[in-house]
């Protein structure tokens, strides 16, 4: 009797708890064009998307730029990538930067040809853009799971009209962008996300949402998910404990599901610019450390009501191993051999 009970419990114990066990592989096509061929844990050349899905990844995040000068990350680029992702059996999460280049808290440049002087014109342009992106994916028989209206928009989006000096404009833009997604021809309406940086900082999250929702121009029903970036190497205050508090408060105050949409852990960090958070200081800078970090992070996300998932940011961008940080290497791929590290298997257990 006891033996049979244990057997019946095994599937529950081994099943993954997170809805989204994800990775952002936006630079895959660029890396392949540069001659990089990824190898699985057996040292065999294999498509990166197949390596990832075989190790438990079930969702891929892709950044989308509007009109980049060289075509990198534009709509056509993302269609090519998404077709491969969908064929591999993973869901697709589009991270709309709403710019021709990088958008983050330090820079939210409005795309070329979009209005920088009239908010009504800009909201209409944004609506038509999100509508067109989703419809183009639908025309290509590609389903979208999540759409983020902007990337790390704690300082606003589509500057100058969408700066935090005018939260009503921010609210109007988010409302308009969301409805472009809702009005699209996607077979199932994608989940709509708002994404902020510093997910561990509850005060930052609270101020943004409280202020933008107070305008009345953005409705709680306009979006489904709250996404956050969580990088442990930019502040000693970015503890797992602080993240847990922040995510818990976000969910309970706004009744939205929460997702950590960007995170990393280094395999090499000889000279970090900032001290690492105290509750992460024992984790080594190694592939084993990546596994330990993601397991601990998953425990935090799973412990939050409606905590849905984690996306590892650019684990295979071999030509940019530091990933913008002061750590030398945050990848899950060996930069000398292009073979994935053992840490990639952690997704099976998240």
Swiss-Prot record:
UniProt xrefs under SUPFAM superfamilies: (Trans)glycosidases
Example of a GO biological process term: pectin catabolic process
Domain of life: Eukaryota
GO cellular component terms, A-Z: extracellular region
Signal peptide start-end: 1-16
Localization per Swiss-Prot or TrEMBL: Secreted
Any Pfam family the entry gives: Glyco_hydro_53
Task of the protein: Endogalactanase involved in the degradation of plant cell wall polysaccharides, and more particularly of hairy regions of pectin.
Record-given protein name: Probable arabinogalactan endo-beta-1,4-galactanase A
Organism: Aspergillus niger (strain ATCC MYA-4892 / CBS 513.88 / FGSC A1513)
Name of the encoding gene: galA
């Amino acid at each position: 009797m006891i033996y049979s009970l244990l057997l019946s419990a095994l599937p529950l114990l081994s099943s993954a708890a997170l809805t989204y066990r994800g990775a952002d592989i936006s630079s895959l096509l660029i890396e392949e064009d540069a001659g990089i061929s990824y190898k699985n844990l057996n040292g065999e050349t294999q498509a990166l998307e197949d390596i990832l899905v075989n190790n438990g990844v079930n969702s891929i995040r892709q950044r989308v730029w509007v009109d980049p000068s060289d075509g990198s990350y534009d709509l056509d680029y993302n269609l090519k990538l998404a077709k491969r992702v969908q064929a591999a059996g993973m869901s697709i999460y589009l991270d709309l930067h709403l710019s021709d280049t990088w958008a983050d808290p330090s820079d939210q440049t409005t795309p070329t040809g979009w209005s920088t002087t009239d908010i009504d014109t800009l909201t209409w342009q944004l609506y038509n853009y999100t509508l067109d992106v989703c419809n183009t994916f639908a025309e290509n028989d590609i389903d979208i799971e999540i759409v983020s209206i902007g990337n790390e928009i704690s300082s606003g989006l589509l500057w100058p009209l969408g700066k935090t000096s005018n939260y009503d404009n921010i609210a109007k833009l988010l409302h308009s962008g969301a409805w472009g997604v809702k009005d699209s021809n996607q077979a199932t309406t994608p989940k709509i996300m708002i994404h902020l940086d510093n997910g561990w900082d509850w005060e930052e999250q609270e101020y943004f949402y409280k202020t933008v929702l107070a305008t009345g121009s953005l409705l709680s029903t306009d979006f489904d998910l709250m996404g956050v970036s969580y990088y442990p190497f930019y502040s000693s205050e970015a503890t797992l404990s602080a993240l847990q508090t922040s995510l818990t408060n976000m969910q309970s105050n706004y009744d939205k599901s929460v997702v950590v949409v960007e995170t990393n852990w280094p395999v090499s960090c000889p000279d970090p610019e900032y001290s690492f958070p105290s509750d992460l200081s024992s984790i080594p800078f190694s592939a084993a450390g990546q596994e330990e970090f993601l397991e601990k992070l998953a425990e935090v996300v799973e412990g939050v009501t409606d905590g849905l998932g984690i996306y590892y940011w650019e684990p295979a961008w071999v030509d940019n191993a530091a990933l913008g940080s002061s750590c030398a290497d945050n990848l899950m791929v060996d930069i000398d051999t292009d073979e994935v590290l053992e840490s990639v298997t952690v997704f099976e257990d998240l």
